[in-house]
């Protein structure tokens, strides 16, 4: 019984090795074309045999030893040994010789204007000595008590800033000081920057701009104050003894 099992395993091993060798022999060689080495017309058998006699060395339609339609030894439709659609060799389909790759996705282009603008904004803030630049805001709707000024603001609001410069709120004792400093530095920087571009502001522009920037600075103060108190509350919460004891107990349970 043992000998019969050993013989069966030897037979299975022999069959597996023989099958692997057979598959290796059947693998196509690189560089050959479709139906290379055959002498029949691909896909259409002729009842009377080949209609035309072979011409030296290759199969039917192989004048120089290649596959069907291989005048120089390439694959099917390969006149010079490349891939299908490669008249002069090369890579994949549509990559023949000096031709560019067909339908190749182009690389995304970097918007240099955005990069330059970001770099300039960072340089201006760095040169102001501790001032930060707030996020962009929608320009507020303000009534100035004069039809002329209201109309002037609606027609020229795009010329006024939509961001403000400010220092951290913990450096000021109250909102008025924060807003006053914020308005002065923002109007000054916007006026200087715009003047260097060849555009001047009138007295009406300055008056309207100060009102607009004041409202924006108030909004910025409210945002910064809320964020500051939330950070302070988080620090107080996690520094209290009960919370520290609870966290230590949880760490002990996890580690232990």
UniProtKB/Swiss-Prot annotation:
Disulfide bonds join 182-217. One of its GO terms (molecular function) is copper ion binding. Residues 234-256 form a propeptide. Cu(2+) 4 binds at residues 88, 90-91. InterPro entries: Prion, Prion/Doppel_b-ribbon_dom_sf, Prion/Doppel_prot_b-ribbon_dom, Prion_copper_b_octapeptide, Prion_N. Glycans are attached at residues 184, 200. Cu(2+) 1 binds at residues 64-66. Residues 25-233 are annotated as: Interaction with GRB2, ERI3 and SYN1. Monomer and homodimer. Has a tendency to aggregate into amyloid fibrils containing a cross-beta spine, formed by a steric zipper of superposed beta-strands. Soluble oligomers may represent an intermediate stage on the path to fibril formation. Copper binding may promote oligomerization. Interacts with GRB2, APP, ERI3/PRNPIP and SYN1. Mislocalized cytosolically exposed PrP interacts with MGRN1; this interaction alters MGRN1 subcellular location and causes lysosomal enlargement. Interacts with KIAA1191. This is Major prion protein. The lineage of its organism: Eukaryota, Metazoa, Chordata, Craniata, Vertebrata.
């Amino acid at each position: 019984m043992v000998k019969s099992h050993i013989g069966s395993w030897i037979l299975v091993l022999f069959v597996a090795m023989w099958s692997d060798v057979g598959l290796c022999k059947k693998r196509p060689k690189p560089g050959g074309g479709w139906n290379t080495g055959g002498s029949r017309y691909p896909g259409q058998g002729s009842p009377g045999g080949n209609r035309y006699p072979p011409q030296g060395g290759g199969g039917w339609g192989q004048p120089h030893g290649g596959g069907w339609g291989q005048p120089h030894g390439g694959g099917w439709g390969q006149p010079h040994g490349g891939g299908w659609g490669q008249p002069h060799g090369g890579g994949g389909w549509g990559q023949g010789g000096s031709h560019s790759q067909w339908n190749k996705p182009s690389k995304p282009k970097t918007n240099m204007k955005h990069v330059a603008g970001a770099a300039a904004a960072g340089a201006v803030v760095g040169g102001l000595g501790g001032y930060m630049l707030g996020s962009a805001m929608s320009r507020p709707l303000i009534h100035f008590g004069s039809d002329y000024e209201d109309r002037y603001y609606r027609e020229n609001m795009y010329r006024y800033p939509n961001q403000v410069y400010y220092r951290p709120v913990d450096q000021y004792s109250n909102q008025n000081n924060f807003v006053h400093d914020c308005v002065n530095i923002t109007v000054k920087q916007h006026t200087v920057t715009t003047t260097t571009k060849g555009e001047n502001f009138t007295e009406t522009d300055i008056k309207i701009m100060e009102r607009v920037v004041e409202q924006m600075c108030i909004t910025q103060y409210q945002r910064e104050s809320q964020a500051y108190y939330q950070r302070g509350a988080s620090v107080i919460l996690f520094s209290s003894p009960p919370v520290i004891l609870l966290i230590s107990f949880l760490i002990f349970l996890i580690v232990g």
